[in-house]
Amino acid sequence: MTTQHSKTDVILIGGGIMSATLGTLLKELSPEKNIKVFEKLAQPGEESSNVWNNAGTGHSALCELNYTKEGKDGTVDCSKAIKINEQYQISKQFWAYLVKTGQLDNPDRFIQAVPHMSFVIGEDNVAFIKSRVATLKKNVLFEKMKLSQDEEEMKSWVPLMIEGRKSDEPIALTYDETGTDVNFGALTAKLFDNLEQRGVEIQYKQNVLDIKKQKSGAWLVKVKDLETNETTTYESDFVFIGAGGASLPLLQKTGIKQSKHIGGFPVSGLFLRCTNQEVIDRHHAKVYGKAAVGAPPMSVPHLDTRFVDGKRSLLFGPFAGFSPKFLKTGSHMDLIKSVKPNNIVTMLSAGIKEMSLTKYLVSQLMLSNDERMDDLRVFFPNAKNEDWEVITAGQRVQVIKDTEDSKGNLQFGTEVITSDDGTLAALLGASPGASTAVDIMFDVLQRCYRDEFKGWEPKIKEMVPSFGYRLTDHEDLYHKINEEVTKYLQVK
């Protein structure tokens, strides 16, 4: 039996950081809007946003070498790094606003100051990182970045990485104290608690079965209650699909033209997690290395301090795995079911093009635990097998789409899809994802609430003072805003 509910203004599908962010922004900008949220699991932030299902890095390009490209002439293109840092500044400003206005409390439960570092081995890589730092330090967003090859200084930063190191190859480290570790699961839960207090209806254990456009222009969303097995249809003026890996199959159900010729390739991740508290307590940094030649961007190895429920942890990875599931809690049929007549050529083209990714995944799947530990010892020479365990992180669905130039291009980023009339939006892809959630949701609002957005700008600038500016070009504004953000988020 299917029951029909009255019309609502907004439906958010998925209980992760993206829906939580969009819902919070809408309640700030247009409090009268009626919002409903549907989440398949029993509580919010349990898939991609869960603390163990992502790296928890506040992505700001302070340590991620894959955000800067080296040219053949030795110059370094930092445009992507600067853009990502600017996006993360927007997220931090919004979170600080929510703390300031009493909507988020105890910021240390979701964000911690953790230095961000880069680590390279070999003359060519050392030359690259020197050029990278020299270029970035010209920008105010990276003014605190340090570089060292001095053994004692490096040891003071990360003793575990220097002790026992026998190789004669040169190494270099960068260090930036303004880095952060973010528990996106805890942040998501806090945002949804606040939304419930403001009248947003959040329903858990709800599986969205279908999304169809009506002649009236509204959307019908069919939802199954997983406890009662009852099906209910809801009507809404606007629908946002922010369901992690499930966003692609849900987008395909809408039938909009933007859902055609697009596919997804799932990649799972494994990490080594330290079980020795003495070791954990001797490392305080997120240290990113350089991906191997031919390896995809999500393969960048990193040794990470994490904070979970106030307790420090230490992880190393990721090691790639393969599962046809689009969600950690998904079905083994997800990948097969996502192949449609309109995207089969797209998917096959990607398969032919991305043989290097296939080889990389096969090599990763064949790794033994001893081989994973050998990879860890490149970072931490004295690591002992008995101090580490393997954990499975979340699923990431990399977007495959056609472009004007060619078919089947694998995208390693976050992609916003909107219908022509702006009544539906979907978020696909992976990193930098959650770190840039606020800026991405501003993009959704600009594209989907075109008539209202201009009137919202004064409130937006109250929440995010840098909105409409590039902090890169306004050094004094950056320092003023950063002082405020630091104060409310209690980070450096």
Curated annotation (Swiss-Prot):
InterPro entries: FAD/NAD-bd_sf, MQO. Disulfide bonds: none annotated. Pathway: Carbohydrate metabolism; tricarboxylic acid cycle; oxaloacetate from (S)-malate (quinone route): step 1/1. Pfam families: Mqo. GO terms for molecular function: 2-hydroxyglutarate dehydrogenase activity; L-malate dehydrogenase (quinone) activity. Keywords: FAD, Flavoprotein, Oxidoreductase, Tricarboxylic acid cycle. It comes from Staphylococcus aureus (strain MRSA252). It comes from the Bacteria. Its EC number is 1.1.5.4. Coiled coil: none annotated. GO terms for biological process: tricarboxylic acid cycle. Its cofactor is FAD. This is Probable malate:quinone oxidoreductase 1. Belongs to the MQO family.
